[in-house]
Design a protein with these regions (language model features):
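Active-site helix of classical SDR
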Residues: 120, 156
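Residue(s) in the substrate-gating loop at a strand-loop-helix junction
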Residues: 140
Length: 279
């Protein structure tokens, strides 16, 4: 049986961990990467209990470090094959534009955008030589719809979307597919431990303090309705197994309706609805 190799970044938790497990269950040999290998406990425990531990190897990878990416490139070079790359590593920067230091924007883009680019550049030569491969980029509905207080995250996902479109057109003729997965709200730590709010917007003297508080309340009040992240992992795995995947896969309660609504109604109406969520 011909082995299939998948690489998943940000695999210590959330979509990344669940996707690594799901791919392994479906016959892939998974290279699960994470910035801190000490956070591999849950992944290893789940893999052992599911009887798929032999299908998963864990490697340290900081997508923002040139040295770390170089070591990763050497690793996949030795393996000589990558059938699927899942660019999942990321976090959510929050706060209001006037108050966010430019370095925090840079940090957001270093992980969510430049990190994905660096890892993709490491595997593309292998995929191109094999004339096959799938690059699945985990975006978000935030890559299609803006929201106040989340401009670092939103802008990084918009950038990922545009880059993915260009990349798909560049590598299609080499037998490589580039796919975007756009989740809505799911039960991961992206809005808890994975969220980094600029300190200035948390100060009571901030002119945006009330809006920041309402944003936090909005996220917290909706958390009970967040969906099972395993659904996203299953979708990513289905895409990996699909012969001719399309460009975008939106997933989550109300996501497709929101995208359609934004496309059809005048912006003035759409913005009133968005702003009403923070009243």
């Amino acid at each position: 049986m011909i082995k299939k190799i998948a690489v998943v970044t940000g695999a210590s938790s959330g979509f990344g961990m669940l996707t690594a497990l799901e791919l392994a269950k479906n016959g892939y040999e998974v290279i699960a990467t994470m910035r801190d290998q000490k956070r591999n406990t849950t992944l290893l425990s789940e893999a052992n209990s599911s009887g798929i531990a032999d299908n998963i190897t864990i490697h340290e990878l900081d997508v923002t470090s040139a040295e770390s990416v170089s070591l990763f490139k050497e690793l996949v070079g030795r393996v000589g094959q990558v059938d699927v790359l899942v660019n999942n590593a990321g976090f959510a920067g929050a706060g209001f534009v006037e108050e966010i230091p430019i370095d925090e924007y840079r940090s957001q883009f270093e992980t969510n955008v430049f990190g994905a680019i660096a890892v993709t550049q490491a595997v593309l030569p292998i995929m191109r030589k094999k004339s096959k491969g799938k690059i699945i980029n985990v975006s978000s509905i935030s890559g299609r719809v803006g929201f106040p207080g989340l401009s670092p995250y939103v802008s990084s996902k918009y950038a990922l979307e545009g880059w993915s479109e260009s990349l798909r057109l560049e590598v299609k003729s080499f037998g490589i597919d580039v796919i975007l997965v756009e989740p809505g709200s799911f039960q991961t730590n992206i809005w808890t431990r994975g969220k980094k709010v600029t300190e200035n917007s948390l100060k009571k003297e901030s002119p945006y303090y009330e809006m920041m508080r309402k944003l936090e309340d909005h996220i917290e009040s909706g958390s009970s309705k967040f969906e099972n992240p395993k659904n996203v992992a299953r979708l990513i795995t289905a895409i990996a197994l699909k012969n001719k995947p399309t460009m975008r896969y939106a997933i989550g309660r109300g996501v497709k309706m929101t995208l359609l609504f934004k496309m059809l109604v005048p912006w003035t109406i759409f913005e009133k609805i968005v702003l009403s969520k923070l009243r």
